Amino acid sequence: LKYKMVLIFLIVIMLTPMTVSAHEHTPIEKLDNISDEALQMIKFQRYDDGKKLLSYFSEQFTDISNKEHPFTRDELRIITVSHDEAMEAAASPSMEYEERVQRLTKFRLVVDAIATSHQPLWTEMKNQILTAFQDAKEAASTGDTAHFHSNFNNFMALYNVIYPSMKIDVSAENIQRIDARINFIDEYRSEVVNNVKSQQELEGLEMDLKNLFENMDEDEADPSLWWVIISTGSIIILTLSYVGWRKYQGEKDMRKNRSRVHKD
């Protein structure tokens, strides 16, 4: 019984950190939650509440930056710019609803990209972005100028929403390659629609976009899961060791009893 109690105690001790970590939020996770709440307020057209949350975010962000310095220079710049745009959206008396939501979404995705080590939220826009682009590509192949312009504008609007977040998670080299293709297509729209050879840029951009999202999908598992894996493995090993020890102890006791019987 004594050994069984020791085993139970060890298992509880090993599981406790997992339970605590599941309920405690890091300062950056708190910022992530605030950004999400601000987005929800703007979606519900509660602009004053959204503005208050953005002000609160700014206070917390400054406090964390001064105390812990968890952000790189690029991250600080990207967060600051996207926060300023979000605050302008919340405070504006005349900005269109869609523009407000777009700016808050951009801000929300930036904070998530910094707070999340794998599969950031911006990758969830994969289907929307690829669909808009493929519609533009199809319009170009049929020579439909009006629909090409419309769909390519939709694609660029969606791409601009995730662009700051991409700069946090994606290498500068990959972003520059995609930017170069987009800028060429945007500048020479008429040529892309009317010239089959120029449409090869559309093929190249489509491939780059697919690779971008596929590489993010293949991201490694959350490092925090390693604690669960290691702890679970340790518990299994500990349990098997205890069972083995009990079996050995039982066999040892049986040998002692047999020895006593023979002596008697």
Across the structure, where does each feature detected by a protein language model lie?
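Short, solvent-exposed, charged loop/turn and helix-capping segments
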Residues: Q60-R77, E96, Y159-Q176
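Membrane-proximal low-complexity regions enriched in glycine and acidic/polar residues
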Residues: V101-A172
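C-terminal amphipathic alpha-helix
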Residues: P27, L31-A38, I42-Y47, E96-H118, ...
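Solenoid-repeat scaffolds in large eukaryotic assemblies
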Residues: Y47-F57, E98-R100, F148, F155, ...
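Long amphipathic alpha-helical segments with strong coiled-coil/leucine-zipper propensity
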Residues: K67-K126
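Extracytoplasmic/lumenal ectodomains and periplasmic regions of secretory and membrane proteins
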Residues: T145-E206
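C-terminal single-pass membrane-anchor helix
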Residues: L1-K2, V6-L15, E214-D264
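N-terminal pre-first-transmembrane soluble regions of secretory-pathway and organelle membrane proteins
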Residues: L1-A86
